[in-house]
Amino acid sequence: MDYKILWTDMHSNIHHEQMNELPQWFDQVQKMMDFWPIAYYPYTMRKDETGLGVEDRYPLDVIEKDWEALREFTEKVNAAGFPMFMGYEWQGAGQDGDHNVFCKDNRQKMEYPLRYADLVKAYAGKDVIGIPHHLAYQLENRGKNWATHNETFSPFVEIYSSHGSSENDNGPIEMTRHVHMGPRTGETCVERGWEDGYKFGVIASGDNHSAPCVYGFGYMACLAEDNTKEAIWDAMQKRHTYGVSKDRIEIRMQVDG
């Protein structure tokens, strides 16, 4: 099969206060990429009783209004022929790692379970995937918990982003951008998942919170039969993906013909 190599930034986090910038974000993506999974970020910083800043979800009515606005925009873009997927970031209780949840259609609702296993159950039987990112941070501090991993729900992982490389805990590309979440650990890194016997692909993507498609923060390549949502979703399910940190290097590989 002669697959098309399609490019995107699969980790564009848009916040509540940025929703009015969505058309501008899309304009940039449309000029640079072939498809776009966007991840709504339902979290904000608040002060606790001691004055310490903590991250918490926006009020539910705010989130649901934004989700419907994102749905409307995605359907408009899809109708115009551009393959866009809507999604959101899920963090739960911080014990299983952060995952971006994406749906094939535009009809799913956001779920807020505290644990990854319950997130998987919430979308059982539906065309939904959850992609872990910045995996190598500490366990229970938003690093990946391989003990709870589901390779069907999470067919690939984000090995590189603006946070750095989660491949292992001693590679040359460190994770020092957010030191409060570090350091990297061998217990949660990507190599540990392979050592545990899981089968999953890898991507790179930005983890951008101000604009999509930032050079140097990572891009995802998807090898698909065509540039449609159906073909792209099928390719992602089959783990036909890879990632680059900077330039869009084209790679074609086969196993067993």
Regions found by a protein language model. Give the residues of each.
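Extended, charged catalytic domains and RNA/DNA-binding interfaces, predominantly
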Residues: 1-257
